[in-house]
Swiss-Prot record:
Organism: Mus musculus (Mouse)
Name of this chain's protein: Cell cycle progression protein 1
Subunit field text: Interacts with MCF2L. May interact with MCF2, ARHGEF1, BCR, VAV1 and FGD1, but not with TIAM1. Interacts with GTP-bound CDC42 and SRC.
Residues annotated as transmembrane: 219-239
Positions of the UniProt region annotated as Disordered: 57-211, 457-484, 553-606
Length: 753
């Protein structure tokens, strides 16, 4: 393209931007004189031209070929203005940049923009100067141009010969920037030479140029229309290419995101695997640590056990060595005796000693049997004594109960003084009975203490006799035969004498205590019976004289129940030897009769049987057949003191107590169903029925049923304590007013009452 075309481009204010490659060319506009010398044809072209034009590769080549002839005519009109501008200014090669000129250092071509005062009146025109086929607008076939308005900036004075290599200028200039290839930069100096040589022929060709300029304008317009259409087509193709590029970039980005996600997933899986591996390692570490600790503890235990075994082995070795030494000595003694020879005297002495030993064994066996019998008899005496104590307490409680009723009737009764005397006598009698009971208790405690002391002394004597006998035998081996026999005889004589004395003393004490207890029990039972009958008759007379309906029913019930208790005690006198043969046989053989112990036992059972809390409990529990009219009647049914209070006996509690006792005493019991079938009829609705049978009789029946089972007929009497355990659990534990019992009495007998 020529200089004129470059001037027209710069004057029209177009900026050309090439989108291909990385090289940029900046084209500055020409001087103000070039802008003023535009022709009329250029102004016509400006009116019809678009503000922005995108020109493709094919459009560029066609427009350049069509407008090459038009550029030649335009040069003539441009020379005069250009020459005047060249005269006014002396341009330097650094001030102006020729269109299409490049340098080896840069691909930027800069054209100086117009001045600010001329920018307002300036219009946009495009002219294409003639150029050779090899120039092709100084761009590659794939170049794309964008034309836009230049930015108004201050610039220095431009020159036509300014080099395109002026990259270092710091002045801003609104010049069209075009990207082009380096290889296709062509110098303009050759194309500028012909127009510089033609100014001499312009005056002669001026009329023809005008006519030609009109046709040229039409051609230019046609070329511009073609170029615009081609530019729009190229722009549409560019948009499609851009869309494809955007789609492709999106696909690439999507592929990259997918790859990144897959990579992150793999990393996460590897991290999870690492985490699980770490947990497994920690678990294995803890297991190994625990195993290590257990191994260390086992090692310590084994070391301690080894040490203990070593010590015990040393002790056993020492004992074995001592036994071996003793065995060696015995063998030596046997050898010495064999050397001396056995004589008939030694054989006789041995026979005599054997006879003594047999006699003493028989005596000790008889003593042991007699001791067991005495112990059993002592237990029976203790039980009888305790029964009498309970009977006295029951009588005292009944007396205290009837005292308020007597006090109320004293005001109405004429025999107040006689009753007071009788009450005083009864109180004195009770005091005497209490004193007798205390005396008997002290005597029984003393007897038991003496018996235990004698037993301990006898045991010590037996152990001493054995030690002396063993020592005497050892001495006899070392000493002469006479010394050995003498020591053995002395030992046996001492044991015999001590045993005889102990047995004699013990028998005397037992006889004395037994006789005293019998007498006291007889006197006590007689006095209690007489006192109770007298008291009963007195109270009966009092209530008969009073004639009160309120006191008549309890009085009759009390007399009836007391008579029933005594009649039942007479019946139990016949049944007691059969039911209690195991525990009372020794004393029965000695005494011959069991009337008083059986009577006292029945009183104890009735006194320790289950009682009731209050009148409401009695009425609520016994609502069938025989209903309790009051607390006195309920107490009379069980033959106990009316001051005792308790809850109804429930079947679950009774079964639990029986199960607990049998498991503790017998350890194994396999007849639970039979026992439940035996117990259940006495507990309708889960509560014991007193109108069917007394609770004491029921306990005796259960005890007899358990004894009747063949598997549990044990000689040690495990079932003898069953009734005491039941009474202790369900009955009232009386606080005995006679002080603490002896320390030698078993807790079961003490706590059961």
């Amino acid at each position: 393209m020529s200089e004129s075309s470059s001037d027209s481009d710069s004057s029209c204010g177009w900026t050309v931007i090439n989108h291909e490659g990385s090289d940029i060319e900046i084209v500055n506009s020409a001087t103000a004189s070039d802008n003023c010398g535009l022709t009329l044809e250029c102004s016509l072209v400006e009116q019809e031209e678009l503000p922005v034009l995108y020109v493709g590769h094919g459009g560029e080549e066609s427009s350049a070929n069509n407008t090459s002839s038009v550029g030649e005519t335009m040069l003539s009109s441009m020379r005069e203005t250009k020459s005047a501008a060249e005269v006014e200014e002396a341009p330097s090669p650094e001030d102006n940049v020729y269109f299409g000129t490049t340098s080896d250092d840069s691909d930027i071509v800069t054209l100086e923009p117009p001045k600010l005062e001329e920018m307002g009146n300036q219009e946009v025109t495009i002219q294409e100067a003639p150029s050779s086929d090899d120039l092709n607008m100084g761009s590659s076939s794939s170049s794309q141009y964008a034309f836009c308005q230049p930015e108004p900036v201050f610039s220095s004075q431009p020159s036509d010969e300014e080099s395109s290599s002026d990259d270092t200028s710091h002045e801003p200039s609104p010049a069209p920037r075009r990207r082009r290839n380096r290889k296709k930069t062509v110098s303009i100096s050759e194309s500028e030479e012909p127009p510089l040589a033609e100014p001499e022929d312009e005056p002669s060709k001026e009329p023809s140029k005008r006519h030609f300029s009109r046709g040229l304008n039409k051609c230019v317009i046609l070329a511009l229309v073609i170029a615009v259409s081609m530019g729009f087509g190229h722009f549409y193709g560019t948009i499609q290419i851009q869309k494809q590029l955007v789609r492709k970039t999106h696909e690439d980005e999507l592929d990259g995101v997918k790859g990144y996600l897959s990579q992150r997933k793999q990393e996460q899986e590897s991290f999870l695997d690492f985490k699980s591996l770490k947990e497994n390692l920690e678990r294995c570490w803890t297991v190994t640590e625990s195993e290590k600790i257990t191994f260390e503890t086992q090692k310590k235990n084994l070391a301690a056990e080894n040490q203990y075994l070593r010590i015990s082995l040393e002790k056993e070795e020492q004992a074995l060595s001592s036994l071996q030494e003793e065995l060696r000595q015995l063998r030596e003694q046997i050898r010495l005796l064999e050397d001396k020879g056995t004589s008939t005297q030694l054989v006789r002495e041995n026979q005599v000693l054997k006879q003594y030993l047999e006699v003493e064994k028989q005596k000790t066996d008889s003593f042991l049997r007699e001791r067991e019998m005495l112990l059993e008899e002592a237990r029976m005496l203790k039980r009888d004594l305790e029964r009498e104590q309970l009977t006295a307490m029951a009588l005292r409680a009944e007396l205290e109960q009837f005292i308020p009723g007597q006090a109320q009737s004293r005001a109405e009764s004429p025999s107040v003084q006689t009753e007071e005397k009788e009450v005083g006598l009864l109180q004195q009698r009770l005091a005497e009975l209490e004193q007798k009971l205390i005396f008997e208790q002290q005597r029984s405690d003393l007897w038991e203490r003496l018996y235990v002391e004698a037993k301990d002394q006898h045991g010590k004597q037996e152990t001493d006799g054995r030690k002396r006998g063993s020592r005497g035998s050892h001495r006899a081996k070392s000493k002469s035969k006479e010394t050995f026999l003498g020591t053995v005889k002395e030992t046996f004589d001492a044991m015999k004498n001590s045993t005889k004395e102990f047995v004699r003393h013990h028998k005397e004490k037992i006889k004395q205590a037994k006789e005293a207890v019998k007498e006291n029990l007889k006197k006590f039972s007689d006095s209690v019976k007489s006192t109770f009958r007298h008291f009963k008759d007195t109270t009966k007379n009092i209530f008969d004289e009073k004639g009160s309906k309120r006191f008549r029913a309890p009085k009759e019930a009390a007399t009836e129940k007391t008579r029933t208790a005594y009649s039942y005690s007479s019946y139990s006198q016949q049944e007691a030897p059969n039911q209690n043969q195991n525990c009372r046989r020794p004393s029965a053989q000695r005494d011959g009769g069991r009337e008083k112990p059986s009577h006292s036992e029945e009183i104890r059972k009735n006194a320790n049987s289950y009682t009731y809390k209050a009148k409401s409990d009695c009425r609520g529990t016994h609502s069938t057949r025989r209903v309790c009219s009051g607390m006195f009647e309920c107490a009379g049914q069980e033959a106990i003191s009316p001051v005792n209070k308790a809850s109804p006996v429930r079947m679950n509690d009774f079964k639990q107590l029986i199960h607990w006792y049998l498991l503790n005493e017998l350890e194994t019991f396999h007849h639970w169903k039979e026992l439940d079938q035996f117990i259940s009829p006495f507990f309708p609705n889960g509560v014991f029925r007193h109108d069917q049978q007394l609770f004491a009789d029921f306990v005796d029946d259960v005890k007899g049923y358990l004894k009747s089972i063949k598997e549990y007929r044990v000689e040690d009497g495990n079932l003898e304590k069953l009734d005491g355990c039941i009474y202790r659990h369900f009955g009232h534990v009386f606080a005995l007013p006679f002080g603490p019992r002896s320390v030698y009495i078993k807790p079961c007998y003490y706590n059961s009452f």
